[in-house]
Structure formats: structure tokens, C-alpha cells
Amino acid sequence: MNKNSDKTLNIKTFFDKKIPIIFEEIDEKEVADGLCYNPYSKDAKILIDNRLGKRRRLNVLIEEITHAFFYELPEYKVRKFSAELGRVLYNQFLKKTKEK
């Protein structure tokens, strides 16, 4: 088990497919902080680089989950949505808990 997770996280897509979310080091030749393998495939999974900071990890997690649900969307739309949602969640919930 890695340092960022006590258990395996999973999501269930619209078509009830269970997809594991795995936090581990991603090979640098991938040039990615996260990867979503085709959610329609037998080996579907989401990888998130466990070396990321909290805020970046949140945004990448949102982005890869969005890919799993809306795999056909172009990358720029997924990134825009993920960045906006990540910003709102971070500022509303995570940043405020730091201030307390």
C-alpha cells in the first residue's frame, strides 16, 4: 500500500463499471501526473502520481475521474472543467481548514 491511501479507492461509471484509483509513481517517460485507461476496456484504471502535492493531486484526480465518465470529451474541456472544480473545492474546503 502506498503512503497516500489506506485502501483501494474505486469509482463506478454510468454503466456501472468499477474502476480502481491507484496512487503510485508514474514513470517520467509518460509525461503525465495522472492517467485514465480506457473505461470501456477490461483493464480500466486510474493512476495518480503519489509524488504530487495536495492541490495538484486534487486537480489531477478530478481530471482523471472526469475522463472516466466522459472519455470522448476533448482534453481541453476536461482540463478546464477539472481546473475550475478543483479551484472551487480547494478554496471552499481545503484552504479554509488550513486557516482554522
Residue ranges and their predicted role:
Residues 60, 80-81, 99:
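Alpha-helix boundary/interfacial micro-motifs
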Residues 38, 63-65, 77-78, 95:
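General N-terminal targeting signals
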Residues 59-71:
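Active-site recognition of the HExxH zinc-binding catalytic motif
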Residues 2-3, 7-55, 70-89:
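Active-site scaffold of zinc-dependent metalloenzymes
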Residues 91-100:
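Short, positively charged interaction helices/loops
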